[in-house]
């Protein structure tokens, strides 16, 4: 099962450097904290609509593969993050199987819990980078994060209803 927003997310083209953009736009795109928390600060109830979740092989993650360790399998989670039931963000998380050990095994069991609720409670969370992307008038970003030094890649597309616009 797929969703048009996730097709567009995968079409994002990334800037080599942070572009000169409006301060408010950069504030959203370069946010280091939880996007879930930012949405809740808008006075909204945040929920997850699950699109796809499960193990995939390298051929299903061509955009992410150069940014992650080469492994036989990866945990893929594709969601819509909704505010008061309206989709504000499409998210795609790719986790190498080697990351899924110890406490990080919980990444497979998030269900309808927003990823940010898990990530930003961890004292071991670090971020290697944020890249800004754009496709057909929509903005997105991707970040390689680490939990206990173990990598995962998070890509987010801000949908038209998002307060980013």
Swiss-Prot record:
<comment type="similarity">
    <text>Belongs to the UbiC family.</text>
</comment>
<dbReference type="GO" id="GO:0005829">
    <property type="term" value="C:cytosol"/>
</dbReference>
<dbReference type="GO" id="GO:0042866">
    <property type="term" value="P:pyruvate biosynthetic process"/>
</dbReference>
<dbReference type="GO" id="GO:0006744">
    <property type="term" value="P:ubiquinone biosynthetic process"/>
</dbReference>
<comment type="pathway">
    <text>Cofactor biosynthesis; ubiquinone biosynthesis.</text>
</comment>
<keyword id="KW-0456">Lyase</keyword>
<protein>
    <recommendedName>
        <fullName>Chorismate pyruvate-lyase</fullName>
        <ecNumber>4.1.3.40</ecNumber>
    </recommendedName>
</protein>
<feature type="binding site">
    <location>
        <position position="156"/>
    </location>
    <ligand>
        <name>substrate</name>
    </ligand>
</feature>
<feature type="binding site">
    <location>
        <position position="77"/>
    </location>
    <ligand>
        <name>substrate</name>
    </ligand>
</feature>
<dbReference type="Pfam" id="PF04345">
    <property type="entry name" value="Chor_lyase"/>
</dbReference>
<feature type="binding site">
    <location>
        <position position="35"/>
    </location>
    <ligand>
        <name>substrate</name>
    </ligand>
</feature>
<comment type="subunit">
    <text>Monomer.</text>
</comment>
<feature type="binding site">
    <location>
        <position position="115"/>
    </location>
    <ligand>
        <name>substrate</name>
    </ligand>
</feature>
<dbReference type="GO" id="GO:0008813">
    <property type="term" value="F:chorismate lyase activity"/>
</dbReference>
<dbReference type="InterPro" id="IPR007440">
    <property type="entry name" value="Chorismate--pyruvate_lyase"/>
</dbReference>
<keyword id="KW-0670">Pyruvate</keyword>
<comment type="function">
    <text>Removes the pyruvyl group from chorismate, with concomitant aromatization of the ring, to provide 4-hydroxybenzoate (4HB) for the ubiquinone pathway.</text>
</comment>
<keyword id="KW-0963">Cytoplasm</keyword>
<keyword id="KW-0831">Ubiquinone biosynthesis</keyword>
<dbReference type="InterPro" id="IPR028978">
    <property type="entry name" value="Chorismate_lyase_/UTRA_dom_sf"/>
</dbReference>
């Amino acid at each position: 099962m797929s969703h048009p927003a996730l097709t567009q997310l995968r079409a994002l083209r990334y800037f080599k450097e942070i572009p000169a953009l409006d301060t408010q736009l950069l504030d959203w795109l370069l946010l280091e904290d939880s996007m879930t928390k930012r949405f809740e600060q808008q006075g909204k109830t945040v929920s997850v609509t699950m699109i796809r979740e499960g193990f995939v092989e390298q051929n299903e993650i061509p955009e992410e593969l150069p940014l992650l360790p080469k492994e036989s399998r990866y945990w893929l989670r594709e969601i819509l993050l909704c505010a008061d039931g309206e989709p504000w963000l499409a998210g795609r998380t790719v986790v190498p199987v080697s990351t899924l050990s110890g406490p990080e095994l919980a990444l497979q069991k998030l269900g309808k819990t927003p990823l940010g609720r898990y990530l930003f409670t961890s004292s071991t969370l670090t971020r290697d980078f944020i890249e800004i992307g754009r496709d057909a008038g929509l903005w997105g970003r991707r970040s390689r994060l680490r939990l206990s030094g173990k990598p995962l890649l998070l890509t987010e597309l801000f949908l038209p209803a998002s307060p980013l616009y």
